[in-house]
Amino acid sequence: MPFLGQDWRSPGQSWVKTADGWKRFLDEKSGSFVSDLSSYCNKEVYNKENLFNSLNYDVAAKKRKKDMLNSKTKTQYFHQEKWIYVHKGSTKERHGYCTLGEAFNRLDFSTAILDSRRFNYVVRLLELIAKSQLTSLSGIAQKNFMNILEKVVLKVLEDQQNIRLIRELLQTLYTSLCTLVQRVGKSVLVGNINMWVYRMETILHWQQQLNNIQITRPAFKGLTFTDLPLCLQLNIMQRLSDGRDLVSLGQVAPDLHVLSEDRLLWKKLCQYHFSERQIRKRLILSDKGQLDWKKMYFKLVRCYPRKEQYGDTLQLCRHCHILSWKGTDHPCTANNPESCSVSLSPQDFINLFKF
């Protein structure tokens, strides 16, 4: 590759691409890579062989880069930082804007599912994306979505916890894909239609695995939940935020069934999730003329969204507009960064990228 210097009469320089990159060929007097430039230029066969080797190296490098982003790899798209700057418009300093797919790739969701405090948050976020935001993700973000979902399913199969939660997530995703895949030719999903059909078959396989799961009893024989005092059992049951969990717990033993029908337990559950105004609009009386809080709860759930509470959430710094997990350090110039942080619910996270 000739290069003309400042003097147009100079012969210029000769470069060749090697495994270590582009190198310049000089003569013997400069003690360089090749002894004689003129002798090198006369070796036409050597030039052809070197060009062939450089092309092979270039193709191999591109292939390795492509394999890293291939859908067959199960590793999440990796970014060194655990935070992302959220900008919604172009400025002189920054061009473009941050998208939902970019934030989904760069925030550490793959590791977050291993944390019990963040697990429910990530699952809820996956559910919201599956409902309405799947088409707004880029191709690599969609592959990342499926890879994280696979890790969630494998974790549930191993831990045998949150089975119903993941069943609902898979059913929501499958229903959305059925609607999107039917729109053939409208390019609503990134990638070949056959690839998405294969992913739908994978979802059905995961659902079958969850349906066939058998809960194994612990090997040790020690103190169980039913061995605790009744007041302590009731206190623990009051920590459950889902009425379906109370119903399932009541099916374990007759004594637990009596506790699960406690009116005060269901009253506190209704007051936790819903406002007084919402409760007054859905009053249900029992045969004895008393409020049936259990029936009221399930009716309220069908009419209003339940209160969401998570052990750990994503937070947005109002000073520097950086999005990160709570407790993650980010470069902030505020005097008190903690006072500038606002916790985001999964829906708030989705709304943050609606332009």
UniProtKB/Swiss-Prot annotation:
Gene3D superfamilies: 1.20.1280.50
InterPro entries: F-box-like_dom_sf, F-box_dom, FBX25/32
Motif mapping: Nuclear localization signal: 62-67
Domain called F-box: residue spans: 223-271
GO biological process assignments: cellular response to dexamethasone stimulus; protein ubiquitination; response to denervation involved in regulation of muscle adaptation
SUPFAM superfamilies xrefs: F-box domain
Function: Substrate recognition component of a SCF (SKP1-CUL1-F-box protein) E3 ubiquitin-protein ligase complex which mediates the ubiquitination and subsequent proteasomal degradation of target proteins. Probably recognizes and binds to phosphorylated target proteins during skeletal muscle atrophy. Recognizes TERF1.
Pathway named in the protein's UniProt entry: Protein modification; protein ubiquitination
Entry protein name: F-box only protein 32
Cleavable signal peptide: none
Motif mapping: Bipartite nuclear localization signal: 280-295
GO cellular component terms, semicolon-separated: cytoplasm; cytosol; nucleoplasm; nucleus; SCF ubiquitin ligase complex; Z disc
Location in or out of the cell: Cytoplasm; Nucleus
